Amino acid sequence: MKTTNKLTVPDLISIGVFTALYFVLVTIATFGSAAIAPGFNNVILPAVCALISGCVYMLLAAKLQKFGGISVMGIVMGLFFMTSGHFIISFAANIVMGIVADFVARAGNYKSKKGLLLSYVLFSYGLFGPIIPMWFMKDAYIANLEARGKDAAYIADLFANINMTTFVIAVAATLVCALVGGWFGQKMVKKHFVKAGIV
């Protein structure tokens, strides 16, 4: 399959399905993070999502093998974050990392294992969009929360564990989890979908 082909209607349908699956996994990661590590859920959310979403990402790349699929998924996620009250940076991070990840995957014709792993790592960092203002735009983030009716106790709890140490942990954990999740996703695609002739 040529990666230069334009996206067709069936391609867009496939992208929509995979984006919906990715959204479900982000939702699961959000609630799971809050249950596993209350107080640190925002810190570990990108890592947890990266760990469990590799199969969806790798299957999309293997099935489509065209530029645009990964980008569209990033854009859709960014639009969701923006319309749900997050900062504009949420949209910017997802769209930028989605497009960059798409270019990296295309450089290896969507077949290079290392290229796809790097692509997935970059895409996973797009989920920092909604939370990175907590570290670097604290006052604006708090003002946004107050405008949405959040009280002082809620805000204090939210920022209790936000510091540069937890930022470094979040970045490192996301890298490791994206590599593990992406590797696992590649194994599952090869074992179950390639052999079955689905991709």
Question: How would you name each of these model-derived features?
Answer:
Residues 9-18, 45, 49, 68-73, ...:
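Alpha-helical transmembrane segments of integral membrane proteins
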Residues 18-30, 53, 57, 81, ...:
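Alpha-helical transmembrane segments of multipass membrane proteins
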Residues 4, 94-132, 182:
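Short helix-perturbing small/polar motifs within transmembrane alpha-helices
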Residues 26-30, 34, 61, 65, ...:
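Membrane-water interface at transmembrane helix exits
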